[in-house]
């Protein structure tokens, strides 16, 4: 028997209320902050991610699903959402729009990663990107928007981790300091970090291996290497977060796993026991648009995994509102009533009344049991005698009361009751 591929999952009917709830609140918060939805293809030119994410990153070197199509083009299933949005921004001339251009997405993401709780090889992200503004007040707004999104979902006990990793002017000196420091402790590093020492130095700070975390504790701090402009930007960001009452913790070891980040980086973590350590994060990527062939353009974004959000909602006992479902069951008895019930079902649905119905001849008792199991509040019963009299029985399934209603008044009566 076939099963879903490793690292993927089916989203079954019982989980759909969570997904609908999260997507609904994502669209709501996006509208509040002036973001417009943009959907990009599920696969892109592989070079887009090699160039933007970085050849030395784990994503490019280990995790991308890349294939060659029949035309010989090398394509990659989307491993992250920012680069495709930036590609679309350039391709469709959005740089002529009023800045900042605010775009959001709800997309499937694909990474060949080790499956674990809240982490899948196919997962889904809500992300938003603000392109064309460098002021730190926009950084604060993006962080606030992410924070308020979780609040809308009922996730309130959160921690905001904040750092600045500088720009292309000051970061090289910081990376040199990291290389010198880690070079003195190379023998204590895991094999991955020994590779990162030359290829992706900042990621040394992010390793979760205990031996590497011990080395990272005394590593140079990015804050000590910021140029005057980056330091002023970082201080301005902290001031803006303070005036909107967003508490933050400065984490000078915080980096992000993609090469395009600059200046602001941040992560949001739930504080509850057993929760995923990070449910969302983002940062500024002022060089990415230029790197993809555009003019120098500042930008900042955020992304959060929907599977991780739902995992945390369940752990906190947060139940989403149920999805709408029919509250009326249509039962019938007899061949003539069978055809009449098909026509009646069509009329009820045209009138906006959702119904369940039976499709094969069963006893009325069996049909009403089915109505109960489906949770219907009302049953419309149509038999041969009712049909001759031009009426139907409307039964209250919760209170066991019923009334005979003329068919030409049935729709109005049901609408009154539901």
UniProtKB/Swiss-Prot annotation:
InterPro entries tied to this protein: aa-tRNA-synth_II, aa-tRNA-synth_II/BPL/LPL, Anticodon-bd, Anticodon-bd_dom_sf, His-tRNA-ligase, HisRS-like_core, HisRS/HisZ
Q: Where in the cell is it found?
A: Cytoplasm
Naming one, the record's GO cellular component terms include: cytoplasm
**Domain of life of the source:** Bacteria
Query: Repressor: is it a keyword of this entry?
Result: no
UniProt keyword annotations, A-Z: Aminoacyl-tRNA synthetase, ATP-binding, Cytoplasm, Ligase, Nucleotide-binding, Protein biosynthesis
Coiled-coil residue windows: none
Alphabetical list of PROSITE patterns matching this protein: AA_TRNA_LIGASE_II (PS50862)
Chemical reaction(s) catalysed:
tRNA(His) + L-histidine + ATP = L-histidyl-tRNA(His) + AMP + diphosphate + H(+)
SUPFAM superfamilies named in the record: Class II aaRS ABD-related, Class II aaRS and biotin synthetases
One annotated GO biological process: histidyl-tRNA aminoacylation
**Enzyme Commission number(s):** 6.1.1.21
Q: Which NCBIfam families match?
A: hisS
Q: Tell me, how does this one assemble? A: Homodimer.
Tell me the HAMAP family matching this sequence: His_tRNA_synth
The family assignment reads: Belongs to the class-II aminoacyl-tRNA synthetase family.
| Name of the protein described by the UniProt record | Histidine--tRNA ligase
């Amino acid at each position: 028997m076939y099963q879903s591929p490793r690292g993927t999952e089916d989203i079954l009917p019982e989980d759909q209320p969570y997904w609908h709830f999260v997507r609904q609140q994502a669209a709501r918060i996006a509208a509040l902050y002036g973001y417009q939805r943009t959907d990009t293809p599920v696969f892109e030119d592989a070079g887009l991610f090699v160039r933007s994410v970085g050849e030395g990153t784990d994503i490019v070197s280990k995790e991308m699903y890349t294939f060659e199509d029949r035309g010989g083009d090398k394509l990659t299933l989307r491993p992250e959402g920012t680069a495709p949005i930036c590609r679309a921004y350039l391709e469709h001339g959005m740089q002529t729009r009023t800045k900042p251009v605010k775009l959001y997405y709800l997309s499937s993401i694909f990474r060949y990663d080790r499956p674990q709780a809240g982490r899948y090889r196919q997962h889904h992200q809500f992300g938003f990107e603000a392109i064309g503004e460098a002021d730190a007040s926009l950084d604060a707004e993006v962080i606030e928007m992410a924070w308020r999104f979780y609040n809308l979902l009922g996730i309130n006990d959160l921690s905001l981790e904040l750092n600045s990793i500088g720009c292309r002017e000051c970061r090289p000196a910081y990376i040199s300091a990291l290389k010198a420091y880690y070079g003195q402790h190379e023998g204590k590093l895991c094999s991955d970090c020994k590779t990162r020492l030359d290829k992706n130095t900042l990621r040394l700070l992010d390793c979760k291996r205990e031996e590497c975390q011990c080395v990272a504790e005394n590593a140079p701090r990015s804050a000590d290497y910021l140029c005057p402009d980056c330091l002023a930007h970082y201080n301005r960001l902290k001031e803006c977060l303070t005036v909107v009452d967003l508490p933050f913790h400065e984490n000078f070891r915080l980096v992000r796993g993609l090469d395009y980040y600059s200046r602001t980086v941040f992560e949001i973590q739930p504080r509850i026991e057993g929760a995923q350590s990070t449910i969302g994060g983002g940062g500024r990527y002022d060089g990415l648009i230029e790197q993809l062939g555009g003019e120098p353009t500042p930008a900042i974004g955020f992304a959060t995994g929907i599977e991780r959000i739902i995992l945390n909602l369940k752990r906190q006992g947060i139940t989403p509102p149920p999805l709408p479902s029919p509250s009326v069951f249509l039962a019938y008895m007899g061949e003539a009533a069978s055809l009449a019930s098909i026509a009646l079902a069509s009329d009820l649905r045209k009138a906006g009344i959702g119904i369940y119905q039976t499709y094969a001849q069963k006893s009325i008792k069996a049909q009403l049991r089915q109505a109960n199991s489906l949770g219907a509040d009302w049953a419309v019963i149509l038999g041969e005698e009712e049909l001759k009299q031009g009426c139907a029985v409307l039964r209250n399934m919760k209170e066991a009361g019923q009334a005979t209603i003329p068919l030409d008044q049935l729709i109005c009566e049901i609408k009154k009751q539901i």
